[in-house]
């Protein structure tokens, strides 16, 4: 009765289970505690987001001129919207360039 078992099928099942557990183990490494938003401090020391401050806004723009996503900058959703609006206004008023030339 044991002669009828397909060994190739068992080997592939072992490989699948090992791969799945390896993926789970790797995922645990990437779950890190998220830091708070750098633009919203509870004690009131957070910078004010305005289009008049191109130095602050340029920290949230990539090298090619795009607005960096919130998952990269750790900015909360409401502050990300304010940043995007301020960057767009600053671009229209020529305080920030639309595209950075290399």
Swiss-Prot record:
InterPro entries xref list: Ribosomal_bS18, Ribosomal_bS18_sf
GO molecular function: small ribosomal subunit rRNA binding; structural constituent of ribosome
Alphabetic keyword roster: Ribonucleoprotein, Ribosomal protein, RNA-binding, rRNA-binding
GO cellular component, as recorded: cytosolic small ribosomal subunit
Keyword RNA-binding: yes
Any Gene Ontology biological process: translation
Coiled-coil annotated residue ranges, if any: none
Pfam families attached to this UniProt entry: Ribosomal_S18
Keyword ATP-binding tagged: no
Oligomeric and partner information: Part of the 30S ribosomal subunit. Forms a tight heterodimer with protein bS6.
Function recorded in the entry: Binds as a heterodimer with protein bS6 to the central domain of the 16S rRNA, where it helps stabilize the platform of the 30S subunit.
Family membership noted in the UniProt record: Belongs to the bacterial ribosomal protein bS18 family.
Name of the protein in question: Small ribosomal subunit protein bS18
Source organism of the structure: Orientia tsutsugamushi (strain Ikeda) (Rickettsia tsutsugamushi)
């Amino acid at each position: 009765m044991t002669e009828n078992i397909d060994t190739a099928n068992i080997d592939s099942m072992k490989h699948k289970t090992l791969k799945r557990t390896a993926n789970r183990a790797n995922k645990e490494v990437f779950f890190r505690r998220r830091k708070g938003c750098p633009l919203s401090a509870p004690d009131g020391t957070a910078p004010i987001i305005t289009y008049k401050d191109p130095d602050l806004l340029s920290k949230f723009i990539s090298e090619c001129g795009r607005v960096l996503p919130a998952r990269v900058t750790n900015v909360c959703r409401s502050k990300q919207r304010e940043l995007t609006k301020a960057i767009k206004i600053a671009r229209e008023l020529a305080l920030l360039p639309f595209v950075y030339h290399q």
